[in-house]
């Protein structure tokens, strides 16, 4: 008997356990001796017990290849799997072959190894104990076929193994041989009764059918015919028709980024004509595009995949793009085994929501078993809804005697569409609000599909809504379950119709959410206000800060000071009324953050700008550009055409990024807000001094010729930490007289550049009056700018009065006013934190920091402030009484009555 090692491929879907996680431990990787990611331990009784084994080689996790990756990357991928992990592993197995004659054993073994090679379906696997690579095995297989081409009719029994191949063992599947055409199989399904279902869910995937010799793809050599296209410019290609794909490519404007999966078997491009040619003489590619609207699982990107949620944007052309259906996983030609139970549904993070058209249900891509139900709405719909944007909207109950009763709607039906509005990507809250808003007596047309098995699994796994938001206002915690947050916090929303605090809490005012940490791990769970409630609270916060009563407002702030600050006036400057109106209009127009901003986790495709805040920012920028000029470049400032102040053009930042360099920016915190708004997402590093004396010693050691005031720099650093900490990517302490902080700074920039970041889900809509250009749209003609120092750079800066290290120390809030446009190392002492709703993110562009001028008597200002604070305090108290509750507990709402 001869012994041969083959590799079996298994796929298992694991549900995360709250205490045990996925129940596995992994080790190895490219940075280890083994080279492969291996399952090192399986927790008894965990989700993986009985499904995975110790020693399994991890091949793929949620569509992300684990071949030739580091162990850190593999662990990070598993951490980003919030609920489910679809893990594909390969497992070695030794089989015994009967001994063959000497003359045929070589050919027989070679044929067996060749068949095993063809059955792998992924790069880098070893199919025998030899450990030879795929390329070597491919060359060996091709050579073997050429040598044996003339003797196929005279094979011994051992030689027949090449023609017949290995039988399927333990669910092991082989990709079709490239030199053997598959024979088409015709299958006819006939329904005997109306209740019978075909039981087939179709899926599709865009692939590269042909590459022209004269195109860029042929010269780039990074693409091959047969490659599966997973993403086009960051948008998932799953379920996109050819027209949608063509439109997406046309919008790329000169730069096309494709994420592809290499099909080693060249299966799609080698389908025989009998299969690829349809009766209507359309190409095989057109056939696939017609089926591309069927539901299947999203294919994650090559980076840690963004969490599943839906993106909704209206397309002005009014075309309809079919949505995917929740339940089943796509059968990729590279998959080799399917488990018996269906995978939990997961939607792509880059779904496109189109305006519905007047097409029929079948034209929209719905399955043939979908049904259309029509009835007139009464006082209520009579349906109980469950699910959400992550799995779809399902019927969990029908009220007896309601208009929907008797129409054939059952528990477990998925609502695909209501009155030409697709429901596949709506949250449960949005679906309920849409149905409730329908006037009584109006005809309701529902397109439903029977998905009872998916509904049952959804209820058991307690999934529904799933998307991520970033907050842009502050809220205090309301025990026991209400979460507090500051600007910039990220939450994972799990239910958009969560009951309020206490057993009698009403639905419709709160979301169930989990706070996300800086390490992308989930933290505490609780409730937060829903979208409409958040808008009210954010408006109230803005009004409070306008009169100096809001969170974080400075002691010396007032309504009059806010009035002059919005007009971009600085001390001693005499601007015309027209100029002030233009500045205020620009601040209102250029940007506006919602209270909750939908975000996704993506990898930066460009070198992110670097903003260094703190008392050593000037020294750090000089050292970085001098030491690493090929990695860093200082963004030069230019004078305004209508004023002596200086600005930094966004086009300058773009040009530096195109050179594959980090743009070093000396800008104010308000300019950092603007950079985030235009989706540059800078790396903001704050250098925190220990004390004023330590800072003075450090600056004298780093820059002996510098005459900058250590007391002033220290006071400004304290102000930055107090009011702009939500902008910091990292904080580096300044200790002693060493360059440890500088080494940490370089390490932070390197690490943050490789980490995924929370980016806006929707692109910024540009106004025709706004010259702002986004990074992905090109900034060649941009006139957008950032605020920087408006004076000539000098080491000795007293701002018109004595301010040296020899002066006595005063409180940081009592320092003298600074000019309107200051560098990041010199923020305005009287500046108070403003939400993006207040300054429209463009305060850096117009210089919103100003001094307070005593145009009115102090008594009148105090009277105005006191009256405004008392009025708003009463309003805020009433709002907080509604928001908070002394009763404990919150509940996850699985369904909502209508």
Curated annotation (Swiss-Prot):
Q: Where is the SH3 domain?
A: 464-538
Write down the membrane topology: Peripheral membrane protein
Residue ranges constituting the Guanylate kinase-like domain according to the UniProt record: 569-750
Give start and end of each PDZ domain.
11-93, 187-264, 369-435
Its keywords, alphabetically, are:
Cell junction, Cell membrane, Membrane, Nucleus, Phosphoprotein, Repeat, SH3 domain, Tight junction
What induces it, per record?
Expression is up-regulated by the depletion of the junctional protein paracingulin CGNL1.
Listed Low complexity bias regions:
780-790
Location in or out of the cell: Cell membrane; Cell junction, Tight junction; Nucleus
Entry superkingdom:
Eukaryota
Q: Where is this region: Disordered?
A: 98-165, 295-368, 759-898
Transmembrane region(s): none
Q: Which GO terms describe its cellular component?
A: bicellular tight junction; cell surface; nucleus; plasma membrane; tight junction
Q: What does this protein do?
A: TJP1, TJP2, and TJP3 are closely related scaffolding proteins that link tight junction (TJ) transmembrane proteins such as claudins, junctional adhesion molecules, and occludin to the actin cytoskeleton. The tight junction acts to limit movement of substances through the paracellular space and as a boundary between the compositionally distinct apical and basolateral plasma membrane domains of epithelial and endothelial cells. Binds and recruits PATJ to tight junctions where it connects and stabilizes apical and lateral components of tight junctions.
Subunit description: Heterodimer with TJP1. Interacts with UBN1. Interacts with occludin OCLN and claudins. Interacts with PATJ. Interacts with FASLG. Interacts with CCND1.
State the family named in the UniProt similarity comment for this chain: Belongs to the MAGUK family.
Q: State the name under which the record lists this protein.
A: Tight junction protein ZO-3
Organism equals Canis lupus familiaris
User: What gene name is listed for this protein?
Assistant: TJP3
């Amino acid at each position: 008997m001869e012994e041969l090692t083959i590799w079996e491929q298994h796929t298992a879907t694991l549900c995360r356990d709250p205490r045990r996680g996925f129940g596995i431990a992994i080790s190895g990787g490219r940075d280890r001796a083994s080279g492969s990611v291996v399952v090192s331990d399986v927790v008894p009784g965990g989700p993986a017990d009985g499904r995975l084994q110790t020693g399994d080689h991890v091949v793929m996790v949620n569509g992300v290849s684990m071949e030739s990756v580091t162990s850190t990357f593999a662990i990070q991928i598993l951490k980003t799997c919030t609920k489910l992990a679809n893990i594909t592993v390969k497992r070695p197995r030794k089989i015994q072959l009967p001994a063959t004659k000497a003359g045929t054993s070589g050919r027989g073994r070679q044929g067996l190894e060749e068949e095993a090679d063809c059955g792998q379906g992924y790069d880098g696997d070893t199919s025998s104990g030899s450990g030879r690579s795929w390329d070597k095995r491919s060359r060996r297989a091709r050579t073997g076929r050429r040598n044996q081409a003339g003797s196929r009719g005279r094979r011994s029994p051992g030689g027949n193994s090449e023609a017949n191949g290995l039988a399927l063992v333990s669910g092991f599947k082989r990709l079709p041989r490239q030199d053997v055409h598959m024979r088409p199989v015709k299958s006819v399904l006939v329904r005997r009764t109306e209740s019978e279902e075909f039981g087939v869910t179709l899926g599709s995937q865009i692939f590269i059918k042909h590459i022209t010799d004269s195109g860029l793809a042929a010269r780039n050599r990074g693409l091959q015919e047969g490659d599966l296209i997973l993403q086009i410019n960051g948008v998932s290609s799953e379920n996109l028709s050819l027209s949608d794909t063509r439109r997406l490519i046309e919008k790329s404007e000169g730069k096309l980024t494709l994420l592809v999966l290499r099909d080693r078997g060249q299966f799609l491009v080698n389908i025989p004509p009998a299969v690829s040619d349809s009766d209507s003489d359309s190409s095989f590619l057109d056939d696939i595009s017609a089926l591309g609207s069927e539901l299947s699982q999203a294919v994650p990107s090559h980076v840690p995949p963004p969490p599943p949620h839906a993106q909704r944007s209206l397309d002005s052309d009014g075309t309809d793009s079919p949505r995917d259906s929740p339940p089943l996983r796509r059968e990729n030609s590279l998959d080799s085994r399917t488990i018996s139970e269906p995978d939990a549904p997961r939607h792509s993070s880059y779904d496109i929501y189109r305006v519905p058209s007047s097409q029929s249900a079948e034209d929209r891509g719905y399955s043939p078993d979908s049904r259309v139900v029509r009835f007139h709405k009464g006082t209520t719909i009579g349906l109980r809804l469950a699910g959400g944007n992550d799995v779809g909207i399902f019927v969990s109950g029908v009220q007896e005697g309601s208009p929907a009763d008797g129409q054939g709607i059952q528990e477990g039906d998925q609502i695909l569409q209501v009155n030409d509005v697709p429901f596949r990507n709506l949250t449960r809250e949005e679906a309920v609000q849409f149905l409730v808003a329908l006037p009584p007596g109006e005809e309701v047309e529902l397109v439903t599909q029977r998905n009872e098995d998916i509904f049952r699994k959804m209820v058991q796994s307690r999934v529904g809504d799933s998307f991520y938001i970033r907050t842009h206002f502050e809220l205090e915690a309301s025990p026991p379950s209400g979460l507090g947050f500051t600007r910039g916090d990220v939450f994972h929303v799990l239910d958009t119709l969560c009951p309020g605090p206490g057993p009698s809490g009403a639905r419709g005012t709160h979301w169930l959410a989990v706070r996300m940490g800086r390490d992308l791990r989930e933290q505490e769970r609780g409730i937060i206000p829903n979208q409409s409630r958040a808008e009210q609270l954010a408006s109230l916060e803005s009004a409070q800060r306008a009169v100096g009563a809001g969170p974080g407002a400075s002691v010396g702030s007032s309504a009059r000071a806010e009035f002059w600050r919005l007009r971009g006036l600085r001390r001693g400057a005499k601007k015309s009324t027209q100029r002030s109106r233009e500045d205020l209009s620009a601040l209102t127009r250029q940007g506006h953050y919602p209270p909750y901003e939908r975000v996704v986790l993506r990898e930066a495709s460009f070198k992110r700008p670097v903003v260094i805040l703190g008392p050593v920012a000037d020294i750090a920028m000089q050292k970085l550009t001098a030491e690493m000029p090929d990695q860093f470049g200082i963004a030069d400032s230019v004078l305004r055409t209508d004023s002596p102040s200086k600005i930094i053009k966004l086009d300058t930042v773009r040009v530096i990024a195109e050179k594959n360099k980090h743009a070093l920016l000396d800008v104010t915190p308000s300019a950092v807000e603007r950079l985030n708004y235009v989706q540059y997402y800078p790396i903001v590093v704050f250098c925190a001094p220990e004390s004023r004396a330590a800072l003075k010693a450090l600056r004298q050691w780093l820059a002996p010729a510098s005459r900058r005031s250590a007391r002033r720099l220290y006071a400004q650093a304290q102000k930055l930490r107090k009011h702009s900490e939500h902008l910091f990517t990292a904080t580096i302490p300044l200790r002693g007289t060493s360059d440890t902080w500088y080494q940490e700074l370089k390490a932070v920039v390197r690490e943050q550049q490789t980490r995924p970041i929370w980016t806006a889900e929707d692109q910024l809509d540009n106004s025709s009056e706004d010259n702002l250009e986004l990074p992905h749209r090109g900034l060649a003609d941009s006139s957008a700018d950032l605020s920087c120092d408006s004076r000539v750079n000098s080491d000795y800066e007293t701002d018109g009065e004595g301010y040296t290290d020899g002066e006595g120390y005063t409180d940081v809030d009592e320092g003298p006013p600074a000019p309107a446009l200051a560098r990041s190392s010199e923020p305005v002492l009287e500046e108070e934190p403003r939400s993006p709703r207040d300054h429209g993110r463009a305060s850096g562009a117009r210089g919103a920091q100003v001094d307070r001028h005593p145009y009115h008597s102090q008594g009148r200002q105090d009277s105005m402030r006191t009256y405004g604070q008392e009025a708003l305090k009463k309003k805020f108290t009433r709002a907080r009484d509604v928001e908070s509750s002394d009763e404990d507990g919150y509940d996850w709402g699985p369904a909502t009555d209508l």
